[in-house]
Amino acid sequence: VVLTDCGTGIVHSVMRPTLQRANGLVIVSGGSVDEARLASETLTWLEANGYGDLVRNAVVALNTATQATQLVKLDEIEQHFKTRVRQVVRIPYDPSLAAGSVIKWDQLKKQTRTAARLLAAHVVDGLAVAE
């Protein structure tokens, strides 16, 4: 398993060869409508550029990075992504993640660790089996 954080540079020249070799994608979306729109536009770009199979097999991590995220319509955002990708996992608000620094597993809340394990399980479930 190789992980790469491509940030927002989906059109960067290194992305095409990276996507051609990928078995799966995790698309991270914030919980706001604007953040969800950007993540959805990324999925649309991928589909329009020949990566529809990757989109259908993708997992969206719906990151509720701030306490205010609870005020938005997370259920509607989640339902939108469920029509486009294989799985959606909500990552709950956690002050350790919100700090934006090094993540220390043992300092995460139990529900955050559970969500991270679920995310990892969904990613592994979608990996192609070598024949």
Provide a role label for each language-model segment:
Residues S40-N57, I77-E78:
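Conserved C-terminal guanine-recognition region of P-loop GTPase G domains, centered on the G4
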Residues H12-V33:
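Inter-motif core of Ras-like GTPase G domains
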Residues T64, Q70-K109:
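Beta-strand-loop-alpha "switch" segments that mediate conformational coupling across diverse proteins
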Residues A99-E131:
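NTP-binding/hydrolysis catalytic cores, primarily Walker-type P-loop NTPases
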Residues L3-D5, I27-G31, A58-T64:
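Conserved beta-strand segments of the P-loop GTPase G domain that flank and frequently precede/overlap
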Residues G30, W45-G50, H80, D125-E131:
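Cytoplasmic membrane-interface segments at the C-terminal ends of transmembrane helices
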Residues V1-V14:
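Switch II (G3) loop of P-loop NTPases
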Residues R21-G24, D53-A58, R84-R86:
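Short glycine-/polar-rich loops that comprise or flank the Walker A/P-loop
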